[in-house]
Amino acid sequence: MGNNVVVLGTQWGDEGKGKIVDLLTERAKYVVRYQGGHNAGHTLVINGEKTVLHLIPSGILRENVTSIIGNGVVLSPAALMKEMKGLEDRGIPVRERLLLSEACPLILDYHVALDVAREKARGAKAIGTTGRGIGPAYEDKVARRGLRVGDLFDKATFADKLKEVMEYHNFQLVNFYKAEAVDYQKVLDDVMAIADILTGMVVDVSDLLDQARKRGDFVMFEGAQGTLLDIDHGTYPYVTSSNTTAGGVATGSGLGPRYVDYVLGIIKAYSTRVGAGPFPTELFDETGEFLCKQGNEFGATTGRRRRTGWLDAVAVRRAVQINSLSGFCLTKLDVLDGLKEVKICVGYRMPDGREVTTTPLAADNWEGIEPIYETMPGWSETTFGVKERSGLPQAALNYIQRIEELTGVPVDIISTGPDRTETMILRDPFDA
């Protein structure tokens, strides 16, 4: 039996993690976000009602679940308050269910200004960030000049630290990026107005998780983005600024690494990517348009159209290696309904003619790669809303089996629609 279960994306994000976390937290006592920020977009559909969460863990809708934002998350006070208000307006007592690590770095207005200014300066080489200040906040953390939630306990010292760091960043904005300076007093006033709310939710997360482990409580760790966007293992520099992989759980929450019991990799039945960066199986034809339309592939956070393509088993195998995946949850299988044939990338043909079955790391090394496809029959029957494996078309079952063969990982959960009820749990991670 696994008490500590990690749910993370195996591709470039947008795999459908939010729904699965919400579903599995029926048995959990805690749900923990351990990396990223409000650049995430987790969509939940419960009894037909849609909820999009960016910063607050997906367990917040569960009455008996405590949601935790761990130290690996960069926290925007403004974004958190906006999200809290939206939920509280619907009668959800967020402040009774949400806890924060005092070590969370804060995202403030100058981080957003820097993010936007840098993307503009990059021009055609823009990374495609969400413009929410995520990267600059992580930079401040690593440079040891960042302000954290815990700094708000001493408001006078916080004000002094803020003044110093803003002088540094405003100098960059004005003199290098030719942008407007950010107003110090406004930033200070905005943060001070909600400081007590934030500090009132602070807890020692590492100790809490250790006590939960000793009691045998079920804990779910909710990843954001996807493995191939990891700052170290992704398609650098077209990556996010945090560790999206299973290793980020320990560093981003304070859980001891030996205590992770099961790692569930969310894998979409095809591939998508938002923003710039390598994408070997990207489709520019009518099939790509079909996947985009049928899958409603528009970002929950930015509204940007996602790039679409066939499933890339080579890239997913890299995710299997890095995360030591225990099992897959296959999502959006229903989007492939009606296609006469489906393809899986099983290798890459390099520019020099070599055939390889592993992914490069640096983005430059992906240039000129051609995907090697395996083609399988599609299916005309609908898989939407099917709740038993026996109800799936044989061609769909063959597709699932081939994914398992190519990756060496079992498909333990199959999602056939956006609602939490439209799911087959073949093996529950908490029972594995």
From Swiss-Prot:
InterPro entries: Adenylosuccin_syn_GTP-bd (IPR018220), Adenylosuccin_syn_Lys_AS (IPR033128), Adenylosuccinate_synth_dom1 (IPR042109), Adenylosuccinate_synth_dom2 (IPR042110), Adenylosuccinate_synth_dom3 (IPR042111), Adenylosuccinate_synthetase (IPR001114), P-loop_NTPase (IPR027417). Its EC number is 6.3.4.4. Mg(2+) binds at residues 14, 41. PROSITE patterns: ADENYLOSUCCIN_SYN_1, ADENYLOSUCCIN_SYN_2. Substrate binds at residues 300-306. IMP binds at residues 14-17, 39-42, 130, 144, 225, 240, 304. The keyword Nucleotide-binding applies. GTP binds at residues 13-19, 41-43, 306, 332-334, 415-417. Its cofactor is Mg(2+). Keywords: Cytoplasm, GTP-binding, Ligase, Magnesium, Metal-binding, Nucleotide-binding, Purine biosynthesis. Disulfide bonds: none annotated. Pathway: Purine metabolism; AMP biosynthesis via de novo pathway; AMP from IMP: step 1/2. Pfam families: Adenylsucc_synt. This is Adenylosuccinate synthetase. It comes from Klebsiella pneumoniae (strain 342).
